[in-house]
Amino acid sequence: MTKKKAFTPLLYLASIVFLPWWISLSLNKSLESWVTNWWNTRQSETFLNDIQEKSILEKFIELEELFLLDEMIKECPETHLQKLRMGIHKETIQLIKMYNEDPIHTILHFSTNIICFVILSGYSILGNEELLILNSWIQQFLYNLSDTIKAFSILLLTDLCIGFHSPHGWELMIGSVYKDFGFAHNDQIISGLVSTFPVILDTILKYWIFRYLNRVSPSLVVIYHSMND
């Protein structure tokens, strides 16, 4: 019975780790064809930003010029003019579908992440007992560590997350999350987040050390500051 009680939280922890990946993969496969079909056939308008509109217009003009040049070389007016119009029409549809891939991926990834969040939230509420057991294990593990090990762990974690060498790691992480939600890569937004988010984390950490650790373990704070200096 004791082994079963110990095994259940571990099984729950493993499911928490692998469940998001499985849900995301399943939803992406099941929703992709539906979202693509809905966007390409049901939308009355095509949503393009200024950069996309300019780019697609340039490609359309280039395509039209190539078709016209081809027809001038062939010199067969009526039949080939009709084929020209059909060819331009088909290529225009392909161009629009190509530029619609970005919003399709944005909708797909954003919807998938929202559904994953809702499912995991419900799963966490249902597994409240297992979470309490895991939390007690973590607290017991941390309690058994010496103050020196705790201070070293905090220092290592803070240097990794908000140290002078961390911006590149934050850039990769934020870019990955940004891409996971289906948004197009934007250097300005990512740079803005990289320059502000670690600062906010640093402030929260210092406040936590000042308010919580000073009260719970003053010796740990002294060791931490000594190692940090």
UniProtKB/Swiss-Prot annotation:
Main location per the UniProt record: plastid
Keywords associated with the record: Antiport, Chloroplast, Hydrogen ion transport, Ion transport, Membrane, Plastid, Plastid inner membrane, Potassium, Potassium transport, Transmembrane, Transmembrane helix, Transport
Keyword Transmembrane: yes
Catalytic activity as recorded in UniProt: K(+)(in) + H(+)(out) = K(+)(out) + H(+)(in)
Any single Pfam family the record assigns to this protein: CemA
Signal peptide range: none
Segments crossing the lipid bilayer: 7-27, 114-134, 154-174, 189-209
Gene Ontology molecular-function annotations: antiporter activity; proton transmembrane transporter activity
GO CC, any one term: chloroplast inner membrane
UniProt membrane topology term: Multi-pass membrane protein
The keyword Membrane is annotated on this UniProt entry: yes
Top-level taxon of the source organism: Eukaryota
Function: Contributes to K(+)/H(+) antiport activity by supporting proton efflux to control proton extrusion and homeostasis in chloroplasts in a light-dependent manner to modulate photosynthesis. Prevents excessive induction of non-photochemical quenching (NPQ) under continuous-light conditions. Indirectly promotes efficient inorganic carbon uptake into chloroplasts.
Name used for this protein in its record: Potassium/proton antiporter CemA
The organism of origin for this protein: Vitis vinifera
